[in-house]
Amino acid sequence: MKISEQWLRQWVNPNNSSEQLADQLTMAGLEIDDRFAVARAFSGVVVGEVISVEQHPDADKLRVTQVNIGAVEPLQIVCGAPNVTVGMKVPVATVGAVLPSDDGTGFKIKNGNLRGVDSNGMLCGASEIDLTDNIDGLLELPTDAPIGTDIREYLGLDNQILDISITPNRGDCFSVRGIAREISVINDLPLQMPNIPDNNQVIHNEAMPAVTVSAVEACPRYFLQSISNIDRTIDTPKWMQDALVQSGLRSHNFLVDVTNYVLMELGQPLHAFDADTIVGDIVVRLAQPEETITLLNEQTISLTGDELVIADDKGALALAGIMGGQRSSVTDSTTNIVLESAFFNPLAIAARARRFGLHTDASQRFERGVDFELPALALARAVDLITSVTGSQAGQIVAMENSDHLPARAPITLPITKVRDVIGIEIEPVVMVRILTQLGFKVEQQADSLICTPPSYRFDMSIKEDLIEEIARIYGYDNIPSILPHLQVSMDYDDTADLTHEMKLALVDNGYMEAISFSFSDAKLEALLDDKALGEVLALANPISSDLAVMRRTLLSSLLPCVQYNLNRQQSRVRFFETGLSFVGHSVSDLVQTPSIAIVAVGDVWDEQAYQNRALDFYDLKHDIEQLLPAKIDNARIRYERSQLAFLHPGQSAKLYIDDQYVGWLGQLHPNTAKQLDLTTTWVAQLSLAPLLTLAREQHAITTPSKFPQVRRDIAILVDSDISLQTLESTIRKASGTLLTDLWLFDVYQGEKVPAGQRSLAFALIWQDKTQTLSDDAVKTATDKVVQALTVEHSAQLRDS
């Protein structure tokens, strides 16, 4: 919004410069986007009076003038302007004056000779001094303009224009009054309101149309007043034209200019109807479906039924709060009008203007909220301006009000200590009361709080933090010192990141590279990686792209596309891992976000080399997974079970448990799934991070190694092939007690001399006591106990050789 500094200072005039004023507004939250003078720089131009005009002896279109600029002798100036006359006062550029030019260097006035006649200066039109005017010729100044006065001073051309960025919540600042109110509070100065006479002293007008408001929620306050016998020969006063032009508005005709002037001055949009075009009575209602109206911009629109319109018996006259209609528009011949001033609910105006591609000053203000107590004052101001300038007569006011539907202004309780807690410094309650009172709040001070009722023009005040912001910005952000809060905080060390980093390093040491991707996935890929254990696929309401439209249920959804990308670029050996969240659930309400680590591997065990290589297998994957476990973990705590996940190979996959707690899964991607993704044999795994971190945090007591010798005993047994190695090892450990310090499988045999459906397994048992050297009898007893347990529990047969 552009606004004139001179206009602002008519309302409040602080003792500071233009730059200081702009800085004050910026620091108060009203950012100054630009600041510039009304006219570009020039010098040497004064007010002069033409005292004689004679025809040039050698040029039909030139005149020789004598001009009084307050010097001892008048200046002789040759002029070609058609409107030069004796007695007129004009801007005079004296010799040495520098006028503005498009190239920025300036145009210097020198003594000249035009067709044999000396010319000592130049009489100026508006364009020569960087102004706009619709008159072809000299800029005629008022007759009371003081001769010899610098024209910049007389016309106020050093007046600064402030281009202010108004934030959406500050609709109350879309006017001179609103900005001046802020300046008055910042500088603790009174606001100088213009004198607005009582608007009730009017003549009675029998022709005034009746008004009905059927949409009271959308329009709870509506004023209409007639003005008749308007003299249209009177032009808009220059001071009003200047104010509008400097605010970025074009001068149209006097009646339209008045409504625009009041809009900029007070912030209330008004609309004038040509009274002679109104048929019957006025009704404020919602539009009828498919009702049409031709607007002032000659655009004909079809309404849908939720737009608010001002209508007469013939149809819609205006799109309320947005733009008037052409049928009732004010023209240069209009002499009788009815003037509208109303409060329209922001919800009734919002989005309607954009629907029809309209953006008007009125809609911009009504959408953000206009003071609902302002319509009567603005109407009185406009009526006074029109009647005082044109000598017209104002008619009666028709007022339709429904206070039940006006915006409520609920009191807000502000604890005094809360201000200190948020801002960080003590502000005296009396200062808070002054600031809030000057901002228009009704303030009731209590022992430990302030009860504040927002003014009618503040639609952005609802919670105590809003009040604290108002206090802080008026008190001055520059006056609030940067003091660090004194807090006693217990900073507990969180080792999650460090432990996770150690797991990542273990995978990197085994040839894996880390991938970082979105938590979103392709719905088609999720369908391939489907299993009832993973719940439902949760779709995003606003996906960033079609291939990232759902939440991933496993990290494979992110890793497999990475594998595809690399295989398509002749990378035959691929290793990736990723840490992140997987999202499992049947709906948003039961969604579980699990921090996980996943790996994927394709290709040979090693990079291409001169020595024999081989394809990756399940045990290589198992080895890589176990690198994520602490080295000190007892293998007896680890258990594997066959996995039932549909997207894994049923014979090459497993579930991992630690201390009977489910940790994750690993195995070969199901061949059918791999085929649909154009992948070769692919090994995958995913583990939950939480149990892995718990394991890593375990504290283990340091024990002294036994100084007594170890004893090894080997046993070979025949067992059914469907009995897992893990089950047999568990049985051995339970039967052996504390003397068994280590155990491993060193031979597997199936074939000749081994019955069908069985296999021969050979185990190494390491026995050791911490207190004594074990005797042969003690070792034999312990070994026999293990063999007996295997025989009883698994029908194992001890092999002699």
From Swiss-Prot:
Keywords carried by this UniProt record: Aminoacyl-tRNA synthetase, ATP-binding, Cytoplasm, Ligase, Magnesium, Metal-binding, Nucleotide-binding, Protein biosynthesis, RNA-binding, tRNA-binding
One of the GO BP terms on file: phenylalanyl-tRNA aminoacylation
Catalytically driven reaction(s): tRNA(Phe) + L-phenylalanine + ATP = L-phenylalanyl-tRNA(Phe) + AMP + diphosphate + H(+)
Entry superkingdom: Bacteria
Note describing how the cofactor binds: Binds 2 magnesium ions per tetramer.
tRNA-binding domain: residues covered: 39-152
CDD domains: PheRS_beta_core, tRNA_bind_bactPheRS
Gene3D superfamilies membership: 3.30.56.10, Bira Bifunctional Protein, Domain 2 (3.30.930.10), Ferrodoxin-fold anticodon-binding domain (3.30.70.380), Nucleic acid-binding proteins (2.40.50.140), Phenylalanyl-trna Synthetase, Chain B, domain 3 (3.50.40.10)
SUPFAM superfamilies per the UniProt record, alphabetical: Anticodon-binding domain of PheRS, Class II aaRS and biotin synthetases, Nucleic acid-binding proteins, PheT/TilS domain, Putative DNA-binding domain
GO CC terms in record: phenylalanine-tRNA ligase complex
Domain B5: start-end pairs: 407-482
Cofactor(s) the protein needs: Mg(2+)
Broad EC category: ligase
Record domain FDX-ACB: where: 706-799
One Gene Ontology molecular-function label: tRNA binding
List of residues binding Mg(2+): 460, 466, 469-470
EC number: 6.1.1.20
Family listed: Belongs to the phenylalanyl-tRNA synthetase beta subunit family. Type 1 subfamily.
Quaternary structure and interacting proteins, as annotated: Tetramer of two alpha and two beta subunits.
Name of the featured protein: Phenylalanine--tRNA ligase beta subunit
Lineage: Bacteria, Pseudomonadati, Pseudomonadota, Gammaproteobacteria, Moraxellales
Record gene name: pheT
